[in-house]
Amino acid sequence: MLAALLAAAAAGAHAEPVLQGKDAYGDWRADKPGTVRLIRPQDLVRPGATRSVASSSRVVPRPPEAQLQVPAGFKIELFAEGLRAPRIIRAAPNGDVFVAETRAGTVRVLRAGEGGKVATNEIFASGLRQPFGIAFFPNGDNPQWVYVANTDSVVRFPYKAGDLKARGKAETVVASLPDGGHSTRDIVFTPDNKRMLVSVGSLSNVAEGMGTPPGGMEAWAKTQPLGATWASELERGAVLAFNPDGRERKIHATGIRNCVGLAIQPQTGLPWCSTNERDGLGDDLVPDYVTSVKEGAFYGWPWFYISGNEDPRHAGARPDLKDKVTVPDVLIQPHSASLGMTFYQGAQFPPEYQGDAFAAQHGSWNRSKRTGYKVIRIRMKDGKPTGEYEDFVTGFVVNDTEVWGRPVGVAVAKDGSLLISEDGNGTIWRVTSAPR
């Protein structure tokens, strides 16, 4: 009854105009399923156009009248509750749902029963150090390992389909990842199973106090990957690459302040990042983004953002990089805190959803207007992003100061439904599409 009460009525089916320019920024009051936004590099405001504001939300218990909103033709229901701040969720090939409970140091396995509700709930592994990313290796229907990205390492467990408990102790694959600061580490494998990609966020906001690189700037730039940082930010604000056994470590891409969510795009095989950009430049800078990540590319942080826009806090520091910044594919409302992402490959949603991406927006703290706290759909056309994104699930915000949910993870279940975790009240929600 509770789940039915909280399951939302679908939003209207009429087409919404695309919000562009300053209209695309807005706040939570403009959010509803079907609202489409397009933020372009030329729409950016100047740094300091508004003052930087600390405005964290207060997480409250889920109100009895709370209703999540989804597009017409969809339904959303409670899938699991009572979890310990669930973060990243990943569906195993057999249909089991693996959940990272980062604060608790555990990875949990959920198995659905009749009616799509959780019937089995077991701790797969415990004693982990802030686990976040989860990946099954090798890709395909018969993985032999479950990899877990801790905040300071990557470990793996031997696995057979249907395991509810780890069948062996954690084997360390990568013994040392940069620790502290932005602590989430996500993990994916390339389609050919040859490389393991791990995202590592920055230690700081904009590399404050990084100083001068060893040997001087000119020598550093000649010998290191494009845009590589050093000292306290060494191998940070980056995606790292390894062999599946942890060897042949290298930097895959740089300048990505905090790639919280990693996913492989099925059509291209390219990794994508869901990224938290920097704070402190005002309400409407800098847009978060979701983007494909090309090997060897530099995405700007900390010296530049969204092309060659220089961060005033690093004025004149790296003129050699100004024209070498890769522009992200899809810009998101600033300070939305874009976290987990996935690509839709299921058989349940309408055909126009095939290949589109979903990303969880955890919600703002550095904006005077409450922003985020929703799940968005990122539109693709022939495997390429249009630059537009639309609100897909809204309703986590109670008022200007309070929220009851903060979306973190998204995953496509074996039956084609979309699962969404939120760590405010420890729940996972399931979006289904009506038969067509």
Where are these regions (language model features)?
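Beta-propeller domain segments
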Residues: 17-71, 143, 184, 202-250, ...
